[in-house]
């Protein structure tokens, strides 16, 4: 059916509706939030972030506009094993038994390492994470998978807590798998010196160090895979520093009640300082 010229020109010259204007504004905010969070947020986290910023919008609206913009979240892939056990080295007992939900910070730290392929060779990355709020306390990027790398990561974790006034670490369990770096004499002596209790799960069982492997998986999915190709170990180190800062301070973590890890820790300490009711 032919359309009259006047009808066509009326359509293209009409003022945009209130919904169209609102959609245009929201598209800008949605694109900004998605880009600022490494492009990993799906509709739910974009919606939560907008509402945290005071931009009230329905989740279904965010879903509709993200579809129009061609934006989506990411899905974590399967982790690969990196640590290599030393069968000749004695190992501590497993004090965790797959219980990764401690009641407070500084009760359980989990650690693991992974690797990143670069044009200059492999970069090895070690993380130490407090299991209470999934906060990364220490990390290290190195060109070799040596004991010194995991020592540097635990030193940073200890330093992080010391800067916050936590000097007594006797309640901390440090849990890893049977990787030779974590069962070495040097590493074991450093844990003992700090008063930290060592705990070791099994190699080959992802469940025995599931939380640490989750952190590695998020790191690979959110930073490493989208950032390929990596030119140098230094590039990986700089990008990792930025990602850890975002992860701890801005990334909404569902386990934490959709707040960043540092916010959950702060809420824990604020609750303890609050006078008892009654």
Swiss-Prot record:
Coiled coil location: none
Gene Ontology cellular component terms for the protein in this record: plasma membrane
GO biological process terms, semicolon-separated: DNA integration; DNA recombination; transposition
A single MF term (Gene Ontology): DNA binding
Entry-linked Gene3D superfamilies: Ribonuclease H-like superfamily/Ribonuclease H
Taxonomic lineage from the root: Bacteria, Bacillati, Actinomycetota, Actinomycetes, Mycobacteriales
Signal sequence interval, chain numbering: none
Protein name as catalogued: Putative transposase for insertion sequence element IS986/IS6110
Ranges for domain Integrase catalytic: 101-268
Keyword terms of this UniProt record: DNA recombination, DNA-binding, Transposable element, Transposition
Superkingdom in the source lineage: Bacteria
Function: Involved in the transposition of the insertion sequence.
Record's keyword annotation contains DNA-binding: yes
InterPro entries: HTH-like_dom, Integrase_cat-core, RNaseH-like_sf, RNaseH_sf, Transpos_IS3, Transposase_IS3/IS150/IS904
């Amino acid at each position: 059916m032919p359309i009259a010229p006047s009808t066509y020109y009326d359509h293209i010259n009409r003022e945009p509706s209130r919904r169209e204007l609102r959609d245009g504004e929201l598209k800008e905010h949605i694109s900004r939030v998605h880009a600022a969070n490494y492009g990993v947020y799906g509709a739910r986290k974009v919606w939560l972030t907008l509402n945290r910023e005071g931009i009230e919008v329905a989740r279904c609206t965010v879903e509709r506009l993200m579809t129009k913009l061609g934006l989506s979240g990411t899905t974590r892939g399967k982790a690969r094993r990196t640590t290599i056990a030393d069968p000749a080295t004695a190992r501590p007992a497993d004090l965790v038994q797959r219980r990764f939900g401690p009641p407070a910070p500084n009760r359980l730290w989990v650690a693991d390492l992974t690797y990143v392929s670069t044009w200059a060779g492999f970069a090895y990355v070690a993380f130490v994470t407090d299991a209470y709020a999934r906060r990364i306390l220490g990390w290290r990027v190195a060109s070799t998978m040596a004991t010194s790398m995991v020592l540097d990561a635990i030193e940073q974790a200890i330093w992080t807590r010391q800067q916050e006034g936590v000097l007594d670490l006797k309640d901390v369990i440090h849990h890893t798998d049977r990787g030779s770096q974590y069962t070495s004499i040097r590493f074991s002596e450093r844990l003992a010196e700090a008063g930290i209790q060592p705990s070791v799960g099994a190699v080959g069982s992802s469940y025995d160090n599931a939380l640490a492997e989750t952190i590695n998986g998020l790191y690979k999915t959110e930073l490493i895979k989208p950032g390929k190709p990596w030119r140098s170990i230094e590039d990986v180190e700089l990008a990792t520093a930025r990602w850890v800062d975002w992860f701890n301070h801005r990334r909404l973590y569902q386990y934490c009640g959709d707040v960043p890890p540092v916010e959950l820790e702060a809420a824990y300490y604020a609750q303890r300082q609050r006078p008892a009711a009654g």
